[in-house]
Amino acid sequence: MRRPFILVLAVALALAAAGCGSSGDGDSGAASGGSSQVKVGIIPILDVAPIYLGKQKGFFSSRKIELTLESGQGGAAIVPGVVSGQFQFGFSNVTSLLIASTRGLPLKVVSNGVASTGKDKADFGGVVAKDASIRTAADLAGKRVAVNTLKNIGDSTIRASVRKAGGDPSSIKFVELAFPDMPAALQAGRVDAIWVVEPFLSTSLGQGGHLIASNYVDAAPDLTVAVYFTSRQLIEKDPDLVKRFTEAMTESLAYADAHPDEARQVLTSYTKIDPGVIQKLTLPKWPPQINRASVQTLADLALKDGLVTKPPDLAALLP
């Protein structure tokens, strides 16, 4: 059962207050040959292809990092896992970290993770059924829209799309659904629209759905969607490890962005996506650099939509 994000933050705050940070029990010690054993909490989706590809290519081992990738339960366990030291690093969408940072969690971004394509109708987005009367994002006002997590990057950027199209986002009824359940829910009419990522975007479009909004693109050009992060305790305890991890991620991101065919192929090593579908997926961008202006936009949207009660301190959160 997926845990609400606010509950997850409460657990993480309790861990931080108890002093159970990564400077304690986390296992980042030297492995055989002098390598550092590093566990990274990830979500096994398309977006994390670069870290798997980087591991295959030896970008981490060449920096004496023995990398273990562990799946979080829909991402819910990753933030408290990093705070407690279960993971040395984690993968998260930016909005989740903005929310966590305003609640006092000792987190720091160390690397970019994934960015939007920056191309309207050629990115993840909002999909409606084939015979729907919804023609533009403005028509989502008053409709039921599925997102994977309430009060997070999905509903915040969908609202941005609706505003951009001239609609009123205040009347949207957001419904929380897991991504794999969204295409069937749309076909059955249980929701009017879904905000969906790959491979479920391709599934829904293959069933006749129509992409009416590229919400990441509408929110900001070249949106930084997700990043890799660590705890401040680990930065203080082992800054050299953090530096080596960041360097390996930078090389992994650049390689994946320049070699899309290899990025597609590595998906077969950690997902169950049909190889035929993999060739049709819309790939995101994996630039090594974080687009700070786009993170500021997400922070502004989070404040505007009530996801945070004060402006996030981006200087403290970003590298």
Residue spans for each PLM region:
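Bacterial N-terminal signal peptides that target proteins for export
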Residues: 1-7
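C-terminal motif of bacterial Sec signal peptides marking the signal peptidase cleavage site
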Residues: 15-19
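Bacterial signal peptide processing site
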Residues: 21-24
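Short, glycine-/small- and polar/acidic-enriched structural segments
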Residues: 27-165, 176, 192, 211-214, ...
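Structured segments of extracytoplasmic/periplasmic soluble domains
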Residues: 54-57, 63, 81, 85, ...
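Pocket-lining segment of extracytoplasmic ligand-binding domains
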Residues: 95-96, 180-266
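Secondary-structure end/capping motifs
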Residues: 236-309
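Hinge/cleft segment of the Venus flytrap/periplasmic-binding protein
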Residues: 310-319
